[in-house]
């Protein structure tokens, strides 16, 4: 049941891969509540996942991007503002990946290079998103430090 809680709001949702993804469910619910959105994930995730099907279902556009790349994020935010017709009201960062886990490395056998990649993908990319949005003035509201 929709209550139009997000009617007229514009958002970018990062990380939808398939119908088991948190980002997927949030995207469905956001649109159900009246939001218009763009979707973003890595180019390989777009090719290998089902995000195109979600985009079609939600009448959303997919903007492939590597969230660890500031240049790619600049493109996502600029294109989203253009596609959605104005500044962005919300961003969902639902991104996480660990090469150590994928390679089944145990805690006492971590590869630190892979751990750095994990942090870049899963955490630092969020800061990069906010930094890009602030520089481009893409978001409706970003608090300033006092």
Where on the chain are the PLM-derived regions?
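Conserved hydrophobic beta-strands of the Rossmann-like cofactor-binding core
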Residues: 10-14, 88-96
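Conserved alpha-helical elements of the SDR catalytic core
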Residues: 26, 80, 125, 132-136
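Conserved glycine-rich Rossmann-like NAD(P)H-binding loop of the short-chain dehydrogenase/reductase
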Residues: 35-51
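Rossmann-fold cofactor-recognition segment
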Residues: 55-71
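Conserved Rossmann-fold cofactor-binding substructure of NAD(P)-dependent oxidoreductases
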Residues: 68-83
